[in-house]
């Protein structure tokens, strides 16, 4: 039995999230149908992190076990031949049994692209979040500083979250304006369900001047979801990177397919 890892990219706007559903309109369903067509047998995938409806994947990683012996490029080309244009396998790599797409990962990175303009842009539909009023970037940075570190993030988890512990280590929140956009980078050991979107909702509320920067510390301390802002829209959220120990030599995510990749590359915590 061989363990194969795949790197996946997908347009989240085209699917009802990652996790398989009876209606079959999820990324996992599309991927497993295509793998079955290519391999002529059912293959079950395990994913690094489940994404919600509308959330995009640039650096998603899955693994599956199989008796089939195929070349790496064969898994890529063969599976892609049966996938819709909104999802594609980027790479395939044999892995040792010690590799696990979810449990071997030690960090995840999400980016959020936010369009700030009085009028929404149809060209950005499904690609970026949108607010119509200016935001105070310095206030959002001050607020974000209260969240970095190891904390109980219960105030930012959804009621449907199945995580065993609400304690996560948030390594970085980077915020950088770029013309009519503000880009956010969230890097942590793991995230709770809706955690990034709930953090975004609170940061935007601070940026709009509805709350002072210190409010985020109060929300965090409360551990109460009702104290935080509403969950922000999913459209601008991208799972960009999943980190694994060097021994697995997981290929890096290809971010060049998004127009903001050069801006994201500069989001290193000093901005």
Curated annotation (Swiss-Prot):
It catalyses: uridine(38/39/40) in tRNA = pseudouridine(38/39/40) in tRNA. Its EC number is 5.4.99.12. Pfam families: PseudoU_synth_1. GO terms for molecular function: RNA binding; tRNA pseudouridine(38-40) synthase activity. The keyword Isomerase applies. InterPro entries: PsdUridine_synth_cat_dom_sf, PsdUridine_synth_TruA, PsdUridine_synth_TruA_a/b_dom, PsdUridine_synth_TruA_C, TruA/RsuA/RluB/E/F_N. GO terms for biological process: tRNA pseudouridine synthesis. It comes from the Bacteria. Keywords: Isomerase, tRNA processing. The active site is at 52 (nucleophile). Substrate binds at residue 110. It is an enzyme of class 5 (isomerase). Belongs to the tRNA pseudouridine synthase TruA family. HAMAP family: TruA. PANTHER family: PSEUDOURIDYLATE SYNTHASE, TRNA PSEUDOURIDINE SYNTHASE-LIKE 1. Formation of pseudouridine at positions 38, 39 and 40 in the anticodon stem and loop of transfer RNAs. Homodimer. NCBIfam families: hisT_truA. This is tRNA pseudouridine synthase A. It comes from Burkholderia pseudomallei (strain K96243). The gene is truA.
